[in-house]
Amino acid sequence: MSQFNFVILYVADVSKSQAFYADLLGRPALEASPGFAMFEAAPGVRLGLWKASDVKPAAGRPGGGELCIVVPEAEIAPTAAAWAAKGIEIALAPTRLDFGLTFVGLDPDGHRIRVFTPAG
């Protein structure tokens, strides 16, 4: 079976999003052009940023979705504070939900990035 190993987000400004994700991931893009940038999000997993106006076939307004990062519970509050200090909009402050402790930040295009610790 094929593995799920590449996520592409449609973005308004590739350069702005590239800078955001380089800072968030702590590494430079593997490749970059005016219309596309690609990162290694984790070993074997790539994150692409594609200029929305260049996408073929043209994409309509996408449905809701999230990128998720799992961290130890002790890192939730400090990570949320560090993101807020960098100017990342926090859509959900650290909160305990049914699935665990979580917070949500937004990238420059409003894509949700959920950081959480699974319950249990």
Please tell me what each predicted stretch does.
Residues 13-28:
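Amphipathic alpha-helical segments
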Residues 13, 107-109:
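Acidic active-site catalytic centers that drive phospho-/nucleotidyl reactions
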Residues 17-21, 83, 110:
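Conserved active-site tyrosine of GNAT-family acetyltransferases
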Residues 1-5, 27-72, 77-106, 117-120:
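Vicinal oxygen chelate
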